[in-house]
């Protein structure tokens, strides 16, 4: 897995660094872009940072300049760089980094070695054929021609064997140079080898019998073909630097022509006159220029594609590593809020943005319909709903006794720190006891065992968890000098588990058994675990168990109605004589778990900095004598080493490792960060409870390195880039993909098509897509720019060959044939048109008209491009053959020169590497067969003349009469020898062309495949990051996530935050468990909550944060994002937005009821504002929550409110009334800790009647609703409140609270007065004076006052 530097490279940052072509640090420019904080904006995923702008071409984008006299701006067009990270030395294409260049040469070495071996095979095969040719025809002594060729064949065998040694891998460049010089020497030596008489043959036809001393063994066509082959091998397979190859090639051409002219065969090829000598030299020079132009082009493009492919494959490997990290990041992020089995289902839909997924959920499959027997079926499509019923699940609720008193004199930051510390211990213990943490509600902590994955020992897990929590809080009190205790309740039964809503979702459980478990905690005793009879049935006698005696302790009044005769028990600990499971005790006593052979050197999440230390491991081995083994679960524990303790103090094994990591002196220490933000290790990926906070800190820390040190980047840029390149090299060296990629390409070895048919179709349409998308040209490897270079080379070769052909007529003082002129004119028009279209397609595609753009897109298709390419690549050959006339048969210079030009026309088919090699090689074969046909076919219509052009070889007369041929027979060369030599020449040349075309197409396809793989990985990573962002926004607010990147914890005080609690008050009447345990009822509730969540996606409500859902209660707040508050026109503008949101929730419920056939839900809303504290609690499962009296009062405004109306406090009334809202004064209610409070109701009654009595009565407590919710307030326990009515209407009803649910039938279509006018909505009053109230934090002694039970339980 990736190391921390790799993490730094994975997460892009907003610092841009660029330099000039020289890479001088003095010219480095640093640009820091501001972070985009909008949750809806996603930065475009950039390529791996190895692709920097520090290249030889500088800024390829160009500088805008004004065109003409108008105001139109056009970018200045510049040539792109050779390849990404190319050096400024164009004459030696290399990377600008030594590390990258060495890695590229190392990774490309299999391809280099393979091509060099192919070159040895070709050279050896050519030597063998020429040896056979000379030996058969006895054109020279064997010792002169055959022996050197055979000796060189043995040398090639030696070179081939040398390629299998390690010495060749280190010195393959010197080996190529040595072979090149040997080939040069051998081929140049053949230039001055003359024909020598051979005894033993008396026939007059023997060529050597009457040979002159100046007659050479090879014709000019044969020797020129050998020159072409040598030069092409030099430029394509010898792998020497470009400047060295070019110098050697030019030197070889000069020596070749020098030797060839000096040892010219005067008998067959008389020297031209003095006037025509300069035309001869110019023509030969142009032919050699064509060879070098084609060779340099092939060399450069081969290097460009090779290095581009290396970068693409390297980026693909890096993106593969990124993909692993992003996948682990996303998995651990979602596992931090829900179990793995539930997360896997949710991950399937996480590939969409939250707002898009909401729309998709609204139109989901119609199969998800209401299935409750008492509800009539209706054609309503539900959102995806993941909830399942599980039996035999143990539920644990734990409450901190004395928390109100402890928090009375604590600041917000201190309180959040204490809760984070304490709940961190519980999270660690929950993980070790195999329980699944559900959530925290204020100071309440609850978890389950046997859900969502069944466990046979679920009851033992919860009991051990409860006992461990009691011990953990005892240690907490000793360390923090506090006086708090734990009250734990456990019950076993059936639950519904799943997720409700579309935003700020979390895994939760619901059922009546859940409520009963909550009741067990409320009726329990501090310091003991209160269990039900259902849980006791799953336990043996290992625990000290006593009767619960609930009635004796609390009385008969309400308990009998609550428990309904259920027997309860209290567990104080394990029996001393049979303590079977001691996991919690061992963890709390400073022991740590030993997992098999791997010794954990600290709590999970500390990374590998200490676990890999040999001294730490040795210290741990010394403690094996003190090992402890749990008799129940078999877990082995060892004493924790003192090195892991902080400052030598005894460490708590269940305590989170960074409870004190934020020191005033040092701040957060990366080494002691949570495990999720440390470099992800393989053994940590299976952990289902890890910290999201660590993920955010890791991303922020590594992404912020360059931001924090941006001022030093100009001086350290080179060092940073070297380290980056070194890390890039280290990563790709560990991956086998690079070697397999070059040595085993994913293509068919015969057809060269991709093995994947879909990839092959994509490859054939890639060029057209480049044109359609108008993709920018960045490097020479770009398909459109590569085509431009091919067309330019084709035009150059065509003009050069045409010029040399016309020069021969100038030298011979013969007018050129009309056919050649016509072909030249038409071909030149095609070449110029193709060149103009290519330039237009590369640089000015955005300026063409629509019709021209469609034409260019059609031309870029696979078949049209091949047809046009076949024409362009054949134009040089067509131009050469257009000069073949009857003069070709009489003047020896014409067939020799035409044959030489035809050789260049054949090798020109190595151009246009984007086209099929089969097509180009086949066309080259057809063109190569042309000279062979011309040698044996006469073009002269008179049969009495020479029968074929081969007869012209036997005529050395300077006469141009085609019907006069008198050559002494003893000086004539046999025509068959020239024909056989030409056949051998073209066969070897075509063999080289077929080989090079195949290699170059493979190289081009590899480059495309590397690009596709890199883009595919980038797309996957971007999708992963989008999913992670989507999940992140649904776990905690975006601005909180940004803060957690740089801070260990998050807590913030807000002076004026708005809070609402909205409850579906009659959901208990709708809820039934007689069908699928009430699952379909919660499906309906999920739809309603989803509609509420959909409101939050509107821009008008962007300042509102959903906090949580508690059963059928929806909690939201505003004013928590200080950045948005500063942008607002008034500090209290968010309160108006929150109130409008509450009104919109009322409308949503009315619309929802219109689709219900028999039941109408009723919404009750409580509103309050004031100072509050927002923070993130937890270490393995984070929870964003808010605390304070403001939250408590808002909860009371809901629980004491009125159906279908919004109840607000007096402080909120003063603010909202000045915004134009009209309220009814209700009276006063008793709020715990606040006494009597005046409240107001919205909307105001329109008939000026007083409020009915049934609206003044107290609604059932949210904590004990029968809707299956756990119903606990986010802070302290909710008291049983009795309001004090200020005034009562004469006609008020006298209904009591027992009949409230039946009498409360408010009309859902109550006429509401619109209180806010357009001109008044933006007007706000001055600061609101608040009443001074004494804060009381003393808990009520009698726990019964917290129970408000309805008869329906």
From Swiss-Prot:
Mg(2+) 2 binds at residues 399-400, 443. This is Adenylate cyclase type 9. Residues 1302-1326 have a biased composition (Basic and acidic residues). Residues 16-27, 1292-1301 have a biased composition (Polar residues). InterPro entries: A/G_cyclase, A/G_cyclase_CS, Nucleotide_cyclase. One of its GO terms (cellular component) is ciliary basal body. Its EC number is 4.6.1.1. Belongs to the adenylyl cyclase class-4/guanylyl cyclase family. Mg(2+) 1 binds at residues 399, 443. ATP binds at residues 399-404, 441-443, 487, 1108, 1185-1187, 1192-1196, 1232. Residues 1-117, 163-171, 236-241, 302-786, 840-867, 913-920, 997-1353 are cytoplasmic. Detected in skeletal muscle, pancreas, lung, heart, kidney, liver, brain and placenta. Expressed in multiple cells of the lung, with expression highest in airway smooth muscle. Residues 1-27, 49-71, 349-375, 642-684, 1292-1326 are annotated as: Disordered. It is found in: Cell membrane. The chain crosses the membrane at residues 118-138, 142-162, 172-192, 216-235, 242-259, 281-301, 787-807, 819-839, 868-888, 892-912, 921-941, 976-996. Residues 359-374 have a biased composition (Basic residues). Residues 49-66 have a biased composition (Low complexity). Insensitive to calcium/calmodulin, forskolin and somatostatin. Stimulated by beta-adrenergic receptor activation. Activity is down-regulated by calcium/calcineurin. The keyword Hydrolase does not apply. Its main location: membrane.
